Amino acid sequence: MNCEVKHALHCAVLVAWIVCFAYFCGVFTEPVEGSVPESPVASYGLIWTVCLYLLRFTALLVLPQCLCNLGGLMMFNAFREKVQLKAAPLLSPFVCFRVVTKGNFPLLVKENIDTNMKTCFEAGMENFIFEVVTDKAINLPPNPRVREVVVPTVYKTKSGAKFKARALQYCLEDDVNILQPTDWIVHLDEETLLTTNAICGILNFCEDGKHQFGQGVITYANGDIVNWLTTLSDSFRVADDMGKLRFQFKLFHKPLFGWKGSYVVTQVEAERDVSYDHGMEGSIAEDCFFSMVAMKHGYSFDFIEGEMHEKSPFTMWDFLQQRKRWLQGILLTVHSSKIAVVHKALLALSLYAWATMPLTSLQVFLCPLFPLPRCLPFDFLLSFVGALNLYMYIFGVVKSFSHKYRNSLLRLAMYLAGALMTIPFNILIENAAVLVGMFGRKDQFYIVNKDIQTV
């Protein structure tokens, strides 16, 4: 089955699933007589009726994000397996792969640098270096293609940026930066592994030169899986990359909903202009804040073909802390006076949909107990949101585990069942992250352990 047939089948299944889900939710059928009050105000009282309707409308804050995910999943083929180079690698622009680390896991960094360098050579890449930016020296072996940059403890940015933003800004200082304005930087996390497809996609993006910033898909199920629960939960993020991320970059060339902090490709001149020096509010989710400022400055973004590989958090505690930091960082970004509402409106809707998740989750219990009169368009939109989010777990598993079930439908069925079983866990963790994130300290940067040898 070729990629075009797979994509057509996926689109047909997605549409059928949305319609069937709406049908089984009773959207297209009349309720049993007497089961729904004709006047909610008379039955529940004015205040409780208003609360019930507000809860229903709150559930639609995520609708713009869902529509973008639908557009991305249906308009663009996610099943092409090979990225073709458009020009000879020898003629490609100079690329710096930059890894930022605290220096707590030196062996992990060294091993991944070696692995990624081999992948670069396998892809035929010539004009590149790896740059490791660390708070503590990790003493990398001498190599003309590897540069270790230790951030001095006394270094301070003009605005007081901290954590990863501080380290990234240090690299851009005149007396530290060795790159030319037209060179490119690929930002990686400690555990990020390149693939030949990702390298080909990056080279095509850089060679094209139409956009200053780009990003691609990251999957989490390659290699040995440490925690199946967190890995299956992260399958949603894979579908989110192939849906919303791809849609916003391919159609609008803007980070309408922000972007991730890894597999980030930037042109040096543009990155130095935007900078990471945005104070504490730009230090928790420095990637998201950076994207909003870049959009404000008028820079354009594009989607990069080819995937990279990372690991999901190894423990549930790390998983919770990771989500908490994202929520707090996006909250600081959305509430920053440095970014105009026109640039952060969709990101704000996405944030508030997440922040009100504990309330919207209650509807699972409240809807049967306090039914409201039917409104076909409204009810269909609610079922659409639920159907699409469920499908994204399934689609994410299909893409993430394709190398593991290639010759076994039974394995695929097991992975899909596992993903569906993790949904309650994911909802619980996301709700906990909201509660901890909204009421906890917002000046901390939790480091997730991705070194498998320490587990």
Curated annotation (Swiss-Prot):
Keywords: Cytoplasm, Glycosyltransferase, Insecticide resistance, Transferase. One of its GO terms (molecular function) is beta-1,4-mannosyltransferase activity. GO terms for cellular component: cytoplasm; membrane. InterPro entries: B_mannosylTrfase_Bre-3/Egh, Glyco_trans_2-like, Nucleotide-diphossugar_trans. Its main location: cytoplasm. Disruption phenotype: Worms exhibit resistance to the Cry5B toxin produced by Bacillus thuringiensis. This is thought to be due to mutants having reduced population of glycolipids which are targeted by the Cry5B protein. Mutants also have reduced brood sizes at only 17% of wild-type N2. GO terms for biological process: carbohydrate biosynthetic process; glycosphingolipid biosynthetic process; protein glycosylation; response to toxic substance. SUPFAM superfamilies: Nucleotide-diphospho-sugar transferases. Its EC number is 2.4.1.-. It is found in: Cytoplasm. Endothelial cells. Glycosyltransferase with a proposed role in glycosphingolipid biosynthesis. Involved in susceptibility to pore-forming crystal toxins in conjunction with bre-1, bre-2, bre-4 and bre-5. Involved in resistance to the nematotoxic C.cinerea galectin Cgl2. Has a role in determining brood size. Belongs to the glycosyltransferase 2 family. This is Beta-1,4-mannosyltransferase bre-3. The gene is bre-3.
